[in-house]
């Protein structure tokens, strides 16, 4: 174990040293922008780019409501979308007249149009895109950049399947750009941004669908897969049933395509003529497939949605080193190398001890959900009447994985989210899942808590497993951890992913169901748990009579404390839904 950690540590440190070598800087991009540090291969490209920093008023199109920062872009727009009109010559009176008229128009910035020069926007007018070109007003590029920056600040650090160093918002597909903006809008938790997200989603998704109709092979492009994964994620956690349904259809399609295209076994090599851009695309796809697995099993963990992808299908190396992937310079392919571990190899090591992960974000979550996959499969035994045989190997692997993440030093955001998910998976190991026979949805969370609101303790949808095969005391240690975490840390996740909120919701739900089945625990565990209950009720300032009452009679009182703990604003507006679900009627 020690040798393995030491070897990986040496490799990571070596890679970090190589990143700082001057020879790795892309010598072809010799023209840097003095305002944003972007680099260009040709001076004329730099000159055109500098127009983006200009404070001059954009020039409006005389035939629609599009505005362009440069005259050459306006000419190109007119040629593509108004080809029956004459092209406006530079400096003509028409341009001046239109500019004067445009200054009198109301500046509505609530809708964003597709990028007219993007690869996925039709070169000729298409009727289905008419609202995005003629009816809705244009949002300025600097406003768009605000949300792009938000994406890379809030979402990307946890799920880095986009190569940020090669990402340039000025030359990517319009639909790809909008998929990032949708996620950023949802992360803020601001109601006006939610409305904006739906409009971004609508425009971006329609452009992408039209682009894919033109050539079925386009679905294999890395940016297309990434865009659809982001649109899927946004839909699954949107608070309307319509978008959620679209998200599940997209998820099913993405899983099917990953298998059909062989992406669950995708590998790459630096040998041969493969250039760096191809390597980046292959690594993007591979990381996206891993994130697809994470998404499926997160839905299983929180909502009991039956997953279809298994970790045993992911027969490819884990993502490459974080140091290489996050480098701000495009490296030569000579410095790229595959991760030596695949998920199964890493899991085998975790049985015996921790390991140093070259990449913590995606790898850590994949391994965590893989262990949960094994725990969940074992729990299926109770569905056919077989006794559950707790496997301590899973508990040991979880402990070793936690140490591995600490050794690998992930970013603070990843550490917090991983810790929440880790405690929930451990809770599943110690406590039964009474919702195993059913799924819940984000729009109907109250259905999972209705039993303690109307005193309907018996329900065919819920199972009441034999508690003697579980450890109620250890399970409740995780519930107590969740309450303390919610009190001290949850308020920090205001502009962020809703993972901690949903994870704590599920931990508390498991705890409440365990209280219902409290009377089933063995006598030897009863005394220990009673002491734990008194400790908890005292720390929560519960009434004295509640502290001395059997936990199974205090479900409603405890749920009120849970509702209060979750009553914080957060990304995606999840907090109020969770609070409402737990608040007793």
UniProtKB/Swiss-Prot annotation:
* PROSITE patterns according to UniProt: ZINC_FINGER_C2H2_1, ZINC_FINGER_C2H2_2
Q: What residue intervals correspond to the zinc fingers (C2H2-type)? A: 31-53, 59-82
Q: Which CDD domains match?
A: fungal_TF_MHR
For this UniProt entry, the molecular function terms from Gene Ontology, in alphabetical order, are: DNA-binding transcription factor activity, RNA polymerase II-specific; RNA polymerase II cis-regulatory region sequence-specific DNA binding; zinc ion binding
Q: Which Gene3D superfamilies match?
A: Classic Zinc Finger (3.30.160.60)
Q: Which Pfam families match?
A: Fungal_trans (PF04082), zf-C2H2 (PF00096)
- The name under which this protein is listed is Zinc finger protein C11D3.17
According to its UniProt entry, this protein's organism is Schizosaccharomyces pombe (strain 972 / ATCC 24843)
Lineage, broadest ranks: Eukaryota, Fungi, Dikarya, Ascomycota, Taphrinomycotina
